[in-house]
Amino acid sequence: MTDESKPTDDQPTSKGRQGARWGQERRLEFIDYRLRWDGQINRSSLTDFFGISVPQASLDITEYAKLAESNLEYDTRARVYRATESFKAVFPSSAVERYLDDLLRVAVQPEIPYGSFLGWQSPVAAVPKLGRRLNADIVGVILRAIRETGFIEVFYQSLTDPEGGERMLSPHALVHDGNRWHVRAYCHKRKAFRDFSLTRIKCCKYVGQDRDRADEDYAWNTMVNVVLTPHPGLTPAQRKLIENDFLMEGGEMHVECRRALLLYLLFQLNLNEDQADQRPEVIQLALKNRDEIKDLIQY
């Protein structure tokens, strides 16, 4: 088995329905997750998912009961353990954010194996995203350069240069702007750190060792405090609703963002200057310290 094909916690082996050779702590997380989101669990849930024996499943449930005795009770008629009214999740993996993320990943990309703990699944739909095809070999070379502090030679296309050309890059991080993936790299042609869309890199070759340049990327290492408030054009009741949505304190929300990613954040929040003429109900938020950070935005 190659390194690339070795199973991880999120992509188990095929011994069980979802895998085996999982430590007991992982199985306890599974019990906690299923009780929280399915409201019940039995031994077959564990044996089917992990490929373990029935006696081992019984031991795992007993061990979980030691951790949180008040979280479950046995239904003798249905022969299942049910979550109690006083259930309190033991593990962070049972958080609502994790559960909804699991649902979304399965709904959006059902063809991709994903070792979630999902059992019963609510019907779910997601707004379609436009597909951007990524080249796994190119990503692999980029990751090698990041891992080994090397530099790469790429053929890169952009809207300003749609025909494309060769670039020498020293990458140090990957970036997701909420819509697509980029690599953050020092461009030896432009003598500056920039973001390069992974889908616009048409070929990529590892050249050799470079020095670690991450500390030289000032915009990457500079954190900016973004202060958000409800849009002033909203009614008082609407502003209160927005405050509750975003857990604001004193009518404000503070977000720490890398300077290099500031433009992406503002675009996501409809706070880019090009979006300023939209209705308050659409924008919903306002940038309180715009004057303070406007010169920090990198276009």
Swiss-Prot record:
Highest taxon, organism lineage: Bacteria
Any one Pfam family match given in the protein's UniProt record, by short name: WYL
Residue ranges of the region described as Probable ligand-binding region: 156-200
Annotated segments matching region Disordered: 1-22
UniProt keyword list: Antiviral defense, DNA-binding, Repressor, Transcription, Transcription regulation
Boundaries of every WYL domain copy: 131-211
Regulation: induction: Represses its own transcription.
Chain residue ranges for the region called WCX domain: 208-299
Annotated region described as WYL domain, given as residue ranges: 96-207
Ranges where the record places region Winged HTH domain: 1-95
InterPro entries: CapW-like (IPR016634), CBASS_pafABC_assoc_protein (IPR051534), WYL_dom (IPR026881)
Molecular-function GO terms, alphabetical: DNA binding
GO biological process: defense response to virus
Complex formation: Homodimer.
Protein task: Transcriptional regulator of a CBASS antivirus system. CBASS (cyclic oligonucleotide-based antiphage signaling system) provides immunity against bacteriophage. The CD-NTase protein synthesizes cyclic nucleotides in response to infection; these serve as specific second messenger signals. The signals activate a diverse range of effectors, leading to bacterial cell death and thus abortive phage infection. A type III CBASS system, part of a Cap17-CapW-CdnC-Cap7-Cap6-Cap18 locus.
Domain notes: Has an N-terminal winged HTH domain, a central WYL domain and a C-terminal WCX domain; the WYL domain of each subunit reaches into the other subunit to form swapped domains. Crystallization in a pH 5.0 buffer alters the relative positions of the domains, suggesting a mechanism for DNA release.
PANTHER family: PROTEIN PAFB, PTHR34580
Record protein name field: DNA-binding transcriptional repressor CapW
Originating species: Pseudomonas aeruginosa
Gene responsible for this protein: capW
